Amino acid sequence: MRATVGLVEAIGIRELRQHASRYLARVEAGEELGVTNKGRLVARLIPVQAAERSREALIESGVLIPARRPQNLLDVTAEPARGRKRTLSDVLNEMRDEQ
């Protein structure tokens, strides 16, 4: 079953299952498709962005090695530079207190 949801063509799960390669080729060419289950939109098939493809290519070629344990950079805490006892945050806080 095909329908249009908003500006996106929507296809039923059965239709997708029977013709997956046809629909994936359309998505790879840049088209967006919606997937419905019993007439209700449940998923969107969107093309992978060029930046994501580049990253994957770099990983496959061994140039880029992804983190083993990725972290949120906001959770990383600053450590004092070698040989120093104060962090940059400490210095900035002191400068603010002097003003």
UniProtKB/Swiss-Prot annotation:
Keyword Transcription regulation tagged: no
Alphabetized UniProt keyword annotations: Toxin-antitoxin system
The keyword DNA-binding is annotated on this UniProt entry: no
GO biological process: positive regulation of growth
InterPro entries, per database record: Antitoxin_Phd/YefM, phD-YefM_TA_antitoxins, YefM-like_sf
Superkingdom of source: Bacteria
GO MF annotation list: toxin sequestering activity
Function per UniProt: Antitoxin component of a type II toxin-antitoxin (TA) system. Upon expression in M.smegmatis neutralizes the effect of cognate toxin VapC47.
Family per record: Belongs to the phD/YefM antitoxin family.
NCBIfam families: phd_fam
Protein name, entry field: Antitoxin VapB47
